[in-house]
Amino acid sequence: MTSIESDQSCVHIRWMIRRDMASVLAIEGQSFEFPWTEDEFIRCLRQRDCIGMVAERNEEVAGFMIYELHKTRIHILSFAIHPEFRRQSVGTAMVEKLVSKLAYQRRNRIVLEVRETNLPAQLFFRQLGFRATGVLKSFYEDTPEDAFLMQFRYEEESVQEGNAKRFAS
């Protein structure tokens, strides 16, 4: 898919393949109190509009993202970075890759739900131009916890020829 140079080394972003599942499950388990199971990942990824991508650094899976394509939006379903690779621009590179798929007249926004107690994720996405647009009461099946609905909107004027797209809210 793409390679992005960062401060420490190259981040390579590519489509997720079956042999990535063990690494993805390990990252999921280290990142969430209620992680998805392998069956949940497989069931999701078998759907026509559900896509998985991974970020590699030094040929090691450093993070993953599962997202769903809708007519006017992209919905991030699961996203996590291995603890050893956090705060090293891996997550930012993955979100930037997803933003590059937006277009003014087609899919023009990215949405996701973030647990109300997951302040690091809220701050990460806010820093990248996402805004909380609503509260989803008792959203999760595993707890009565609420979720913030966060959204990034594509703005055509934020695109500069020859430069990467800029984030806009």
Write out the residue ranges for each language-model feature.
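Acetyl-CoA-dependent GNAT
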Residues: 6-7, 12-86, 95-97, 101-105, ...
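A detector for short, charged/polar N-terminal pre-domain segments
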Residues: 2-3
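Conserved catalytic-core motifs of GNAT/GCN5-like acyltransferases
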Residues: 113, 126, 131-147
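Generic recognition of short, well-ordered alpha-helical segments
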Residues: 36-39, 93, 123, 145
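A generic structural signal for short beta-strands and their flanking turns/coil linkers
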Residues: 72-77, 108, 128, 146
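Conserved glycine-rich acetyl-CoA-binding loop
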Residues: 82-96, 103-105, 109, 115-123, ...
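Short secondary-structure capping/turn micro-motifs that flank functional sites
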Residues: 44-45, 118-119, 141-142
